[in-house]
Amino acid sequence: NGNPPHKQDNVFQTTREDRMEMVTRSIEKYDYFRLEDYEIKRQEISYSYQTMEYFKEKYPENHFYFIIGADSLFMFEQWVHPERIAATCTILAAYRDDKNNRQVMEDKIAELNRKYNADFRLLVTPVLPMASHELRNRLQQGGSVTGEIPIEAEEYIREHHLYQ
């Protein structure tokens, strides 16, 4: 997200342009990924419903998948216009075997599907050893994140002395 409403205190410690460049470098070798700069170009706060509606209008022939974490799944009803997000895409809630209770997540997904007449699904993901804040902390302490993030992003972080 280029300018998320819940992170207005520069918790990223990077600019939007830095984040965009890290993603660009990380995905350039994959034909099936494309970075959209819609949120980066916006000066105002970006809300997910606006972004998803923009994509649906710009690419009406495409079906979109919106990936969220378990924490976001349980907070989804507090988002701005959750019903509009649910109307534009399939929402995949990432399940991590080491962190989440699968049955509780499946129950919440069923509840949201009923409430919004939507398509929420469970996305079983590989267990990643570190959360993003742990990666940033490791970098701040001068540690290595080799193998934890794409090498292209790691090189950019080192070149630009980010998270220090």
Model-identified regions with their sequence ranges:
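Nucleotidyltransferase catalytic core that binds NTPs
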Residues: 1-164
